[in-house]
């Protein structure tokens, strides 16, 4: 993975540094478990690994990764940015308004309709982001540690 990440960083014009490689590998390692990472999430994971990468460096690297397209930034109804690896373009998000949990989903019909609507307005869809805000139908489905006060 490190060799692939080295090639990736070089291909987007970023210098290969240990913090960049470490943060990218960490996001890849935890992608299934945590699809959306805040800078603080990354920093906590780094601390668990006894890394000496500081929070300011984490913010800087995440912003650089976003600028070159490695990451996508989201602000799911909050001022706190979260990032996800830019590996799966065709998905959207449902955010629970009670607990803040984010679910990713794919729907070919929605993707098709977005392209059609763009074309109806004489445009070609380049990218999109769709956030659906909902409430968990079963409150026990909500993750209590994430509940909003």
From Swiss-Prot:
Chain segments carrying region Dimerization: 88-149
A molecular-function term among this protein's GO annotations: zinc ion binding
Binding residue positions for Zn(2+): 36, 84, 93, 96, 99, 104
Location(s), subcellular: Cytoplasm
Subunit composition and interactions: Homodimer.
Species in which this protein is naturally found: Haemophilus ducreyi (strain 35000HP / ATCC 700724)
GO biological process, one term: negative regulation of siderophore biosynthetic process
Main subcellular location of this protein, as a coarse class: cytoplasm
A cellular-component GO term for this protein: cytosol
Name of the molecule in the record: Ferric uptake regulation protein
Entry keywords, A to Z: Cytoplasm, DNA-binding, Iron, Metal-binding, Repressor, Transcription, Transcription regulation, Zinc
PANTHER family per UniProt: FERRIC UPTAKE REGULATION PROTEIN, ZINC UPTAKE REGULATION PROTEIN
């Amino acid at each position: 993975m490190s060799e692939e990440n080295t090639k990736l960083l070089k291909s987007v014009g970023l210098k290969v540094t240990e913090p960049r490689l470490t943060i990218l590998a960490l996001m890849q390692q935890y992608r299934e478990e945590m699809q959306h990472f805040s800078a603080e999430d990354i920093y906590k994971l780094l601390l668990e690994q006894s890394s000496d990468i500081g929070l300011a460096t984490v913010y800087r690297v995440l912003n650089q990764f976003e600028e070159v397209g490695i990451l996508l930034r989201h602000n799911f109804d909050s001022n706190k940015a979260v990032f996800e690896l830019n590996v799966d373009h065709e998905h959207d998000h449902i955010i629970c308004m009670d607990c803040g949990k984010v679910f990713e989903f794919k729907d070919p019909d929605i993707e098709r309709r977005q392209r059609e609507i763009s074309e109806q307005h004489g445009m070609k869809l380049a990218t999109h982001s769709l956030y659906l805000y909902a409430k968990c139908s079963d409150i026990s489905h909500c993750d209590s540690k994430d509940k909003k006060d």
